[in-house]
């Protein structure tokens, strides 16, 4: 496979304003390279519903053009420090989906087709508002492969971090000015989901806590961006379209960037596998808010503004992401103890003659698979493989000094536990863990 990697002097800051049409992988041309320690700044288009109703897209998201990282080689890892993650949209729409039969081949996220003229992934345009607003530009027929079974329009107060679903009348007004309200980046190619004006749920106030649903490094084979995970990726296995893969190929090539993990937000650090030369850092699918599980299948996809800092971790071979969550996002059992608690532990050790008190720090492994049970086993096995700790010891650590948390149904989880500091040192990430959790001084 030829990797589309540019050769030019490393840059301190790269601004990205170009996007994919739903496909990520080694054939994409990368920007950069960015120097090790440099920053990537971008505006991200919404994921999911906008790309879903735009037939030219071959995946469920519209992520940024990938950026090569100086010195990142296959078998390394790249730490992405999320410095800023802000919502740009003033409104969005989302809800529970259903498919329109006859308008896709195997997978409506990947292989859309006009049922009237037979054109695959046709160009399209929006006429009016409502469920039938998207039309094929080849023959003029209505072409949207998706419908809401229950949907809503939600307006966003970005400064005060609150939001509110609106009634049909307000949704129709918003649908008349989708550009002003969605605030898509200039080069985004998706239709705004606001044009559908679906308003089955009104008057519900919700907190805002933005995060990135899809962030990481390129898989080593081209695939739909939304399917770069062990759950949605299963729909690629023996699929009847151009992106069909075997299970072995999926497992070997994906990087699990599509996590929908609500703690992947400003202040978090995502440590990603490098499976192509230069890594190819990409991001998108910002959500304004989401509870654990994303049980509706889709959350509040918004345009956003993101700033990252990159750091290469040499020789850290990963199968999927490691997450260093913000201290306030850690599960309670995995939070480092404060000075008073450590003093109590020291006295407890003295009382029972325990000579050693382990120095450790929190770490989270992302696991993915067709089901939550599969994802949990995957996350636990990744933790054992990377740390060298016995699998059963990981079970015990995650039970009494950690947690298993659902990120997304049907199959993405967080496996968090306190890991011995010498192991974190060996992995080359102890400095990140110490800085993230204040472990060089008194923990808060």
Locate the predicted segments by residue:
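N-terminal, charged/glycine-rich beta-strand/loop interface patches
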Residues: 2-262, 273, 277, 337, ...
């Amino acid at each position: 496979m030829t990797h589309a990697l540019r050769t030019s002097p490393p840059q301190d800051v790269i601004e990205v304003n170009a996007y994919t049409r739903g496909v990520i992988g080694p054939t994409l041309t990368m920007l950069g390279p960015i120097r090790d320690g440099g920053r990537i700044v971008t505006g991200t288009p919404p994921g999911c519903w906008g790309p879903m109703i735009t037939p030219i897209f071959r995946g469920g998201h519209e992520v940024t053009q990938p950026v090569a990282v100086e010195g990142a080689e296959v078998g390394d890892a790249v730490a992405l420090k999320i410095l800023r993650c802000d919502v740009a949209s003033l409104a969005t729409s989302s809800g529970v989906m259903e498919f329109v039969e006859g308008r896709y081949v195997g997978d409506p996220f990947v292989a859309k087709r006009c049922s009237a003229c037979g054109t695959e992934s046709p160009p399209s345009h929006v006429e009016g508002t409502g469920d039938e607003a998207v039309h094929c530009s080849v023959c003029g027929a209505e072409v949207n492969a998706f419908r809401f079974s229950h949907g809503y329009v939600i307006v966003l107060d970005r400064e005060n971090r609150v939001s509110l679903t609106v009634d049909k009348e307000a949704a129709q007004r918003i649908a008349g000015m989708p550009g002003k309200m969605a605030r898509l980046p200039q080069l985004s190619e998706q239709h705004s989901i606001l044009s559908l004006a679906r308003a089955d749920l009104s008057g519900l106030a919700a907190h805002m806590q933005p995060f990135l649903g899809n962030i990481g490094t390129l898989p080593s084979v081209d695939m739909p961006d939304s399917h770069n995970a062990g759950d949605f990726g299963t729909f690629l296995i023996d699929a009847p379209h151009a992106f069909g893969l075997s299970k072995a190929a999926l497992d070997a090539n994906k990087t699990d960037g599509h996590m929908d993990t609500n703690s992947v937000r400003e202040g978090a650090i995502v440590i990603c596998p490098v499976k192509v030369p230069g890594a190819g850092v990409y991001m998108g699918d910002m959500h304004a808010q989401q509870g654990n599980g994303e049980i509706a299948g889709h959350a509040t996809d918004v345009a956003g503004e993101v700033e990252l800092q990159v750091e290469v971790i040499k020789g850290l071979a990963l199968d999927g992401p490691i997450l260093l969550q913000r201290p306030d996002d850690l599960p309670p059992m995995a939070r480092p103890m404060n000075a008073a608690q450590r003093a109590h532990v020291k006295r407890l050790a003295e009382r029972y003659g325990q000579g050693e008190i382990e120095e450790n720090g929190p770490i989270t492994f992302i696991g993915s698979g067709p089901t939550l049970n599969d994802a949990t086993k995957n996350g636990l096995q990744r933790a054992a493989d990377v740390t060298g700790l016995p699998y059963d010891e990981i079970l015990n650590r995650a039970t009494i000094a950690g947690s298993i948390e659902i990120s997304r149904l049907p199959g993405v989880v967080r496996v968090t536990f306190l890991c011995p500091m010498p192991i974190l040192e060996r992995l080359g990430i102890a400095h990140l863990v110490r800085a993230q959790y204040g472990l060089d001084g008194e923990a808060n």
